[in-house]
């Protein structure tokens, strides 16, 4: 991919990210779950925006999964268990400007299957 095209794709994702973040916010009882996807790994964290603290986080690098649909689903199930340990059953999902398909959708579906509402 040419550098100019790559820069515009990244700039467009960051614009989408800012639009999304202007509309959603998390608190202690309803945290924002932010997803970051790289080519190799997937990272997620539950954030309380009122105090700007991370409640819990998990990465596919730590769990040994890859950033594909199967890895996203496994990470979603593991993160749902971690959220339940902290006592969280409902979240606000922040897809971070990524399209809701593929690995991001697999992660979200795994959260829903494990009774996390968003």
From Swiss-Prot:
Pfam families: Ribosomal_L18p. Keywords: Ribonucleoprotein, Ribosomal protein, RNA-binding, rRNA-binding. GO terms for biological process: translation. GO terms for molecular function: 5S rRNA binding; structural constituent of ribosome. Gene3D superfamilies: 3.30.420.100. The keyword GTP-binding does not apply. The keyword Glycoprotein does not apply. This is one of the proteins that bind and probably mediate the attachment of the 5S RNA into the large ribosomal subunit, where it forms part of the central protuberance. Part of the 50S ribosomal subunit; part of the 5S rRNA/L5/L18/L25 subcomplex. Contacts the 5S and 23S rRNAs. Belongs to the universal ribosomal protein uL18 family. HAMAP family: Ribosomal_uL18_B. This is Large ribosomal subunit protein uL18.
């Amino acid at each position: 991919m040419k550098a100019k095209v790559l820069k515009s794709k990244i700039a467009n994702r960051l614009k989408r990210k800012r639009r999304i973040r202007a509309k959603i916010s998390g608190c202690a009882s309803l945290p924002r779950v932010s997803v970051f996807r790289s080519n190799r790994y997937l990272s997620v964290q539950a954030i309380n925006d009122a105090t700007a603290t991370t409640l819990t986080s998990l990465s596919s690098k730590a769990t040994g999964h890859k950033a594909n649909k199967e890895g996203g689903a496994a990470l979603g199930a593991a993160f749902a268990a971690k959220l339940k340990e902290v006592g969280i059953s409902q979240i606000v999902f922040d897809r971070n400007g990524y399209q809701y398909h593929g690995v991001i959708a697999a992660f979200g579906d795994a959260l829903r299957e494990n009774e996390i509402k968003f």
